[in-house]
Amino acid sequence: NVGLKAVFKDYKLTYYTPDYETKVTDILAAFRVTPQPGVPPEEAGAAVAXESSTGTWTTVWTDGLTSLDRYKGPCYHIEPVAGEENQFIAYVAYPLDLFEEGXVTNMFTSIVGNVFGFKALRALRLEDLRIPPAYVKTFQGPPHGIQVERDKLNKYGRPLLGCTIKPKLGLSAKNYGRAVYECLRGGLDFTKDDENVNSQPFMRWRDRFLFXXEALYKAQAETGEIKGHYLNXTAGTSEEMIKRAVFARELGVPIVMHDYLTGGFTSNTSLAHYCRDNGLLLHIHRAMHAVIDRQKNHGIHFRVLAKXLRMSGGDHIHSGTVVGKLEGEREITLGFVDLLRDDFIEKDRSRGIYFTQDWVSMPGVLPVRSGGIHVWHMPALTEIFGDDSVLQFGGGTLGHPWGNAPGRVANRVALEACVQARNEGRDLAREGNEIIRKAATWSPELSAACEVWKEIKFEFAAMDTL
């Protein structure tokens, strides 16, 4: 510890500046810092600031060749975390010139690249980032955004419905296409490739794209509604990914998909640019996010990954349900849902939002709800997330005792009933079950679904609390 203290003294002298006034062009970060025993919070916070901006572990003569005061990222405020021993929120301001324009990759490499393995810290978590308008404006953002998507699909005034095709792995391309067709003709808007469906021996990507598009056009002709299937173009190289997106565009389908964390921000931004230039919507899956965001005291909170996705580009992103089988604490989830959809979001610590964020008219992203949800969840989902969301039922469609199309009908009927009830001024939170029961009296498909899932609950406390 003596050695550590000797090294970190320098950091505190240079990088802890509580009188610093933040600039409108600064990128601001809130880190949850857990110092090692014996390391004061100011020193730990200053060490984080230094190591993620201009500092290194010792004084170097080349420091004299530049203006460190201009480029250093100071730690300007530290506060203890309520209810936690030896945890602090350290606020760091980064000058805009430290970052390449329009590169999420570079932003993350700087801010979280090195500092998380630091010896002086027991744990470190990036809780939030404030992206200044000057930096936001260097990004294209989502290829199209919420309003343009609704106009393309001609769907207004309700959440969109989706379904992941199951079993996720093992179907042949033709059987996969059959499942897509059954779901789409039953009344949903989208079907989805599972995130791990890329191009495996049992189903190569080109065959899947062809059969899924055939299913989509057949369902469109039958229902008179515009349909989509998220064709997952994620691949081993960026070039192969773009090749798949080009093929999707040639088929004339409306939307493709990407796994943005496993695929990487550079690939994702390339694909987002291609999608805007070629009129494709882009659905984003967050596979691998829990590796980064699940631990409360170490990693990166999902709200930061969500902001980065809005900058990199995507029209939909999976973002927790509040109900169902996957994590999500209500206020915190709604906080980052607003950060995805809205143009201006006020600081609100009760929802985990550490900074006011102004997106200066960057298009919004539709949050996607998926994971263990079924018809009984519909009133809660409609109430909590409103119209601008995609509700994705995988097992909640394909698990219907009568098959895919009736499962889809049940979900659409439940959704329309909830939207109508809400528009009539009814309280979905209180009357939800009754609304579903009433709709089930004239929809045998919904009635059967209500029987199957009436008792299912996923009762675990959320780990992500304030």
Swiss-Prot record:
Record-listed N6-carboxylysine modification sites: 192
Localization, UniProt: Plastid, Chloroplast
Transmembrane segments: none
Main enzyme class: lyase
Enzyme Commission number, as recorded: 4.1.1.39
A Gene Ontology BP annotation from the UniProt entry: reductive pentose-phosphate cycle
Binding site for substrate: 114, 164, 168, 286, 318, 370
One Pfam family matching this protein: RuBisCO_large
Catalytic function, reaction form: 2 (2R)-3-phosphoglycerate + 2 H(+) = D-ribulose 1,5-bisphosphate + CO2 + H2O; D-ribulose 1,5-bisphosphate + O2 = 2-phosphoglycolate + (2R)-3-phosphoglycerate + 2 H(+)
Residues where Mg(2+) binds: 192, 194-195
Subunit field text: Heterohexadecamer of 8 large chains and 8 small chains.
Recorded family membership: Belongs to the RuBisCO large chain family. Type I subfamily.
Protein's name according to its UniProt entry: Ribulose bisphosphate carboxylase large chain
Naturally occurring in which organism (per UniProt): Lobelia sp
Gene assigned in the entry: rbcL
